[in-house]
């Protein structure tokens, strides 16, 4: 069992903070009662929860010292999981005007360290150790979703600071927690998200933040509550192609933490969750203009990515220079030359 009382005592948590107590209790109860975690899975889940809560505490402490925080304009890349968001995100990352939180920054963010300095290299090394153990738990994950310590990663690794992240459902069978995620007040997660970016900006303020997480899909109102000037790029791909892929990925991840994998249950709950997210998105996006919210087709991204980049920049009135275009073209060429493992399921 994951001992809630011991975690509370070890971290000196204040569970009178209802923004923390509800997700904490729902998550741990779901892991204990439903997940059927292996011994190693319990250790991993407990470690992650404690790390996420430590970072949450540090965020609260540091944020108190920031006067009138304001975050640079963010671009959110959204869409169903496995719909091409990573390729689109990585293309946009070639623009030096864009900054995205790096994996190591979300794993070992505090205290802030000097860019390219010795302490940053030490943090990257610590994050590489996390990835080493991740590879031991989930050997095939890099073939399906490669992660590097010094590369941008998804916002689900920021939302964990609020204990409101679909990451936990990917890790383990947590149906009660997934139901909570579908119906909870996600402003709690975006409050942590905003605080985290505000802190990162103290060291390096970008022209624009570039952010990605499929679970942003049904949270446009909550995002705009903290980022009123946000822009959204929504990539559309047939769910018949995307949903089976994320179900397969979920099953692969869970094998590292449990020996009891119910593929039918994963499929049913995955469809229900993303159907609800999509319905929320359909109503919320009606409030936004085409200059704030742009839908793009997966086929266009694959067939002619550079032309799509030009369309995106023109739509949002962003300047696209030759240097950035060349970087994007180079990224595409490099990707086409690299041997990729096909996701079979």
Task: Give the ranges of each region predicted by the language model.
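PAPS-dependent sulfation machinery
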Residues: 107-209
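Long amphipathic N-terminal alpha/beta scaffold segment
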Residues: 40-80
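Phosphate-binding beta-loop-alpha motif at adenosine-nucleotide cofactor sites
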Residues: 207-214, 230, 268, 288-311, ...
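Conserved phosphate-donor/acceptor-positioning beta-strand/loop module used by diverse small-molecule
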Residues: 212, 223-248
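Charged, amphipathic alpha-helical linker segments immediately N-terminal to NTP-binding catalytic cores
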Residues: 13-56
């Amino acid at each position: 069992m994951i001992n809630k009382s011991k975690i509370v005592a070890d971290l000196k948590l204040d569970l009178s903070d209802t923004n923390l107590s509800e997700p904490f209790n729902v998550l741990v109860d779901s892991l204990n009662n439903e997940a059927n975690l292996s011994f190693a899975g319990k250790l991993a889940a407990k470690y992650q929860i404690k790390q996420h809560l430590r970072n949450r505490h540090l965020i609260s402490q540091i944020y108190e010292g920031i006067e009138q925080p304001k975050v640079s304009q963010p671009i959110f890349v959204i869409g169903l999981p496995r719909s091409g968001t990573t390729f689109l995100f990585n293309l946009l990352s070639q623009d030096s005007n864009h900054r995205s939180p790096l994996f190591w920054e979300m794993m070992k963010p505090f205290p802030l360290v000097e860019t390219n300095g010795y302490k940053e290299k030490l943090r990257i090394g610590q994050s590489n150790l996390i990835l080493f153990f991740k590879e031991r738990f989930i050997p095939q994950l890099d073939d399906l979703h490669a992660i590097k310590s010094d590369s941008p990663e998804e916002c689900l690794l920021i939302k964990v600071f609020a204990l409101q992240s679909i990451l936990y459902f990917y890790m383990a069978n947590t149906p009660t927690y997934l139901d909570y995620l579908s119906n909870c007040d996600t402003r709690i997660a975006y409050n942590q998200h905003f605080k985290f970016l505000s802190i990162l900006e103290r060291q390096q303020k970008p022209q624009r933040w570039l952010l990605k997480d499929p679970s942003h899909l049904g949270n446009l109102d909550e995002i705009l509550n903290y980022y009123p000037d946000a822009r959204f790029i929504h990539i559309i791909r047939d769910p018949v192609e995307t949903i089976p892929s994320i179900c397969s990925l979920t099953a692969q991840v869970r094998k590292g933490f449990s020996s009891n994998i119910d593929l039918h249950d994963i499929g049913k709950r995955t469809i229900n969750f993303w159907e609800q997210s999509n319905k929320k998105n359909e109503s919320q996006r009606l409030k936004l203009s085409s200059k704030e919210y742009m839908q793009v087709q997966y086929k266009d991204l694959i067939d002619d990515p550079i032309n799509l980049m030009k369309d995106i920049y023109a739509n949002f009135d962003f300047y696209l220079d030759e240097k950035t275009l060349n970087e994007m073209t180079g990224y595409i060429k490099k990707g086409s030359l690299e041997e990729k493992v096909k996701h079979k399921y």
